[in-house]
Amino acid sequence: MLSRLFRMHGLFVASHPWEVIVGTVTLTICMMSMNMFTGNDKICGWNYECPKFEEDVLSSDIIILTITRCIAILYIYFQFQNLRQLGSKYILGIAGLFTIFSSFVFSTVVIHFLDKELTGLNEALPFFLLLIDLSRASALAKFALSSNSQDEVRENIARGMAILGPTFTLDALVECLVIGVGTMSGVRQLEIMCCFGCMSVLATYFVFMTFFPACVSLVLELSRESREGRPIWQLSHFARVLEGEENKPNPVTQRVKIIMSLGLVLVHAHSRWIADPSPQNSTADNSKVSLGLDENVSKRIEPSVSLWQFYLSKMISMDIEQVITLTLALLLAVKYIFFEQAETESTLSLKNPITSPVVTQKKVTDDCCRREPTLVRNDQKFHTVEEEARINRERKVEVIKPLVAETDTSSRPTFVVGNSTLDSSLELEMQEPEIQIPSEPRPNEECLQILGNAEKGAKFLSDAEIIQLVNAKHIPAYKLETLMETHERGVSIRRQLLSKKLPEPSSLQYLPYRDYNYSLVMGACCENVIGYMPIPVGVAGPLCLDGKEFQVPMATTEGCLVASTNRGCRAIGLGGGASSRILADGMTPVVRFPRACDSAEVKAWLETPEGFAVIKEAFDSTSRFARLQKLQMSVAGRNLYIRFQSRSGDAMGMNMISKGTEKALSKLHEYFPEMQILAVSGNYCTDKKPAAVNWIEGRGKSVVCEAVIPAKVVREVLKTTTEAMVEVNINKNLVGSAMAGSIGGYNAHAANIVTAIYIACGQDAAQNVGSSNCITLMEASGPTNEDLYISCTMPSIEIGTVGGGTSLLPQQACLQMLGVQGACKDNPGENARQLARIVCGTVMAGELSLMAALAAGHLVRSHMIHNRSKINLQDLQGTCTKKAA
């Protein structure tokens, strides 16, 4: 029951991090300002002359206080040193944040809530540092860091709170009761220190239960789109640590603590309420205190400096003991930051058998491109625990290795994608001691029992046994990744299943699948995965657009495309750059339904301001970014087709606006109950199909881009003339496309550039059908009409920087090259609009270069040279009649 309450609390805190953090900070500020209204303005030494303010402090007290401070600093140093052994800098950062905020809360309580002076912190902070325990904070952080997604982060934080919360609560209660005994000693300094200790425990407990889990959840959520190759919380080697015994409370210890707590409660109750001193003694003591106060009355004085200068001077003036403490802290900090890195790395390398030389020495000569760590059997005698564990892991690999198909072990090139530590973390999960898997497949019943066992699972089954279960229909082939301990093993088994059904079993030999972060693919980008397709990525640029320079990534297998686009970018740059504007921004899915009461009546109602306002309110309520702009309707018999045009922020927007469309239809159904919805999409959008409606009305981002190329650049870079390019553009792009009955195809090869950028940047490649709509216009300009004016208008660029393939790390790298990765925080939607402008500008560069090649007669020659380099084409003549003068 108690664990369930803590679990609910942890889930709430992790699910609402902003609310909890803001509430905690607000409460802290309230405590800071509480005595501004209830307390007095007496500050000894500034506006009051207090006779008792300057007290003689015994040298023994100074020595004890200095030793206490040094011990506290050493204690914190060793705690952080232990955290570094885990090999994660994120735990260090989170633990440091926990320490800083706990100290801030505690200091606030001491200074303001109890109306204490800053001098009280000299005694308070050492005890706070001695009582803080980062092990619990790091344990909760490890729960969160073992997650693969944000939802799993919340669940793991809730699970960690359920496990650690009751234990931590009991520990805090026991510590407060034990330390609180000192407040009844009658020794004033001991009572003050014990009071500080109790407040330290309570402040730490408060932060651990509220601010810390919320902050962990928020930090990991903001770090989802990490630049380091994978999400920072994917530290899979923590998963096994979390299942260990250290997080499970010892029932014997818990009972002892409960009994101790009850005994201490009785002690406190007897001392504070039952054994109160007699009223006579209290009266006498009070009279003595009052007499003492009368003799030492504080006198108000005029401040000579401002309050902040007074506090600053007190903090700057340092005694010898403060110098000693600060020097020790600085020395340890320098040692920790600069001199322990190499030592820690060497220690971690010794603890990690995957990175040891014994592990990696075998495959060095086999294939330099293939990274497949294989453990080597060593017949020497070992005596350490680490080496014995390594031998057990080697035996396990030797048992599993013969089950791999022969084609998998053959030498072949394998591409490396993502962080190399991903393999290590995945292999760490599989390498557990004492896992013996027989070479012969076991019966299906036994395999099913092992698979359903929560403590064993698929890692205790061989690949042959998994294939046997799939063939027997016990495991669906599409669920292999979710049932295996690693996604990569699921992909490997599917490849083995598929290879047996192909005409050529070795067909998948050159399709790589290793070293890829499949956690970003599953449930988002692809199903039934058998590998990934490496495509060459070139760069064109710099593209000078709107006063900025962009290096444009292009993924293509067409020779000359990147080189041609790069030449166009150079010509635009020499001409002073290009300018672009967004003409419209919106996505337009469609719904289709038969006559609700009458199609014309519904159409007329939707065209009224009242009807549009009702639909817009329902539509806008489904998203922070989707905002309905207008409705466009068309009637065909009994059917009514509606185009919803809406802004979609930085996303491409189909899913976002489909959700808004469903909500709007539900609201429309309330006004017309007899309405019947046939399909959410009725092809009036139109999505991924050539259509005049997108060419005329626009879809996604509508962009126009223009540039002026000087005559000198046309002659020297493009190797042609303005007159020739204008004539070819009219006869090819305009007249030729019209003769072909083209819709939106009044360009030379816009689809080439659009598709190459889409593949490189994680866009939906099929969207190039509508996104490639473009009209290229050229005309002579300048004083002598020798300069070339070129413009490209693209009314339907469907593009986004969040969601879909943009979550994959290689595609994110290409988006980062352009500075548009993820959502724009300052102006939602700006990244997607900027990417659309870059696409249009790059298309214009490609159009410029290709039209120049056509005008100069270089197109066939360049393609034949680059794509068929063995053919001698020195005497090949151009094919165009118009050439450069």
From Swiss-Prot:
Under Gene3D superfamilies, the record lists: 3-hydroxy-3-methylglutaryl-coenzyme A Reductase, Chain A, domain 2 (3.90.770.10), HMGR, N-terminal domain (1.10.3270.10), Hydroxymethylglutaryl-CoA reductase, class I/II, NAD/NADP-binding domain (3.30.70.420)
Task: Give tissue specificity per the record.
Answer: High expression found in liver, heart, kidney, bladder and subcutaneous fat. Lower levels in lung, uterus and large intestine. Lowest levels in cerebrum, spleen, spinal cord, stomach, ovary, longissimus muscle, and small intestine.
Carbohydrate-modified residues: N281, N296
> Which residues does this entry mark as bearing Phosphoserine?
S869
Relay the activity regulation note.
Regulated by a negative feedback mechanism through sterols and non-sterol metabolites derived from mevalonate. Phosphorylation at Ser-869 down-regulates the catalytic activity.
GO terms (molecular function) for this protein are: hydroxymethylglutaryl-CoA reductase (NADPH) activity; NADP binding
Give the Cytoplasmic compartment stretches of this protein: 1-9, 79-89, 150-159, 221-248, 340-885
Functional pathway: Metabolic intermediate biosynthesis; (R)-mevalonate biosynthesis; (R)-mevalonate from acetyl-CoA: step 3/3
Motif extent (INSIG-binding motif) = 75-78
Per the Swiss-Prot or TrEMBL record, the active site comprises E558 (charge relay system), K688 (charge relay system), D764 (charge relay system), H863 (proton donor)
Subunit details: Homotetramer. Homodimer. Interacts (via its SSD) with INSIG1; the interaction, accelerated by sterols, leads to the recruitment of HMGCR to AMFR/gp78 for its ubiquitination by the sterol-mediated ERAD pathway. Interacts with UBIAD1.
Q: Which family does it belong to?
A: Belongs to the HMG-CoA reductase family.
Its recorded name reads 3-hydroxy-3-methylglutaryl-coenzyme A reductase
Question: What is the species listed in this Swiss-Prot or TrEMBL entry?
Answer: Sus scrofa
State the gene name recorded for this protein: HMGCR
